[in-house]
Amino acid sequence: MDLDRDANLAVQGSVAAGSMDRGDGTAPRFSSAERGLSVLLDILDELGMRGTFFIEGRTAETIDCSCLQGHCIGLHGYDHEDLTGESTGIPMGPSAVSEALSKGFDAVSDAVSRPVCFRAPYMACDDAVLGAVSDLGIRHDSSFYSDGPMEPYETTHGITEHPVPKGKDAAGKTIAAYLWPMHEGRRPPADYIRFADTAEGDFILADHTWHMVEARGGILDAGAASENAAKTADVLRGILDLGFEPAVLLRFGGRSGRRPRPARR
């Protein structure tokens, strides 16, 4: 799960991200991230699951993250930086990347605990970013998509990659294991359950906490937010019913334990 600023928005000419304008400009907001975190944690508690939370440094400094004790803590940059320059058009050099990640690492460490894994903002990652991540002592990453087997694999700098699944649905349309389209009303929960049923190996399901209570079109009212939470719970229950066992990132593969292959139906 990505715990970052509300409805993050790449701002042209700025390395740091903003939030979608709700009438007061694009300055970062964090209230939906905090409210959505509470909703998501309630769902996980109800299902007896722990989550992996990739936390942005500034978010960790702004909201109360103490509720995340006991969950797996990862790093998501400091200011939701576009570390490769793909979205903002501003390439960050190696020293700037290292500085941003180090600042985020310290902020998350102070607010919750030392991050043990990493996901790049915008899923924009390259070898230079992995090098900076490795310098922080982090050895697990989840910044890449894969349309093949979902086994963790070794990358450069001694880092193990845990890819996010991506493939085709029954209609031949691209689908990824990010719940973003569901929250925006473009996919039903059943699409993700069917996608998981085709997976070989681990199935990493990704989401944003702010998306529990806000969509790109605006803040959700109480009824819409409740329906949104119910859909999220339906996805998780449906995947568990396939035979998957819940696990945080560092329990996927390797010496830290393996989730058994789900029973096929």
Predicted features, each with a name:
Residues 2-6, 58-60, 79-81, 122-125, ...:
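Short, solvent-exposed loop/turn segments at secondary-structure junctions
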Residues 37-41, 64-65, 98-106, 130, ...:
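Generic structural signal for well-ordered alpha-helices
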Residues 45, 194-265:
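C-terminal domain-boundary segment and adjacent tail
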Residues 1-70:
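Active-site beta->alpha N-cap acidic-glycine motif
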Residues 84-85, 130, 153-154, 214-221:
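Histidine/acidic-residue-rich catalytic or RNA/ligand-binding cores of hydrolases
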Residues 47-126, 204-212:
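Metal-dependent polysaccharide deacetylase catalytic core of the NodB/CE4 family, i.e.
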Residues 21-31, 50-56, 84-97, 116, ...:
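The substrate-binding groove and active-site-proximal loops of carbohydrate-active enzymes
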Residues 117-201, 207:
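Active-site-adjacent pocket scaffolds in enzyme catalytic domains
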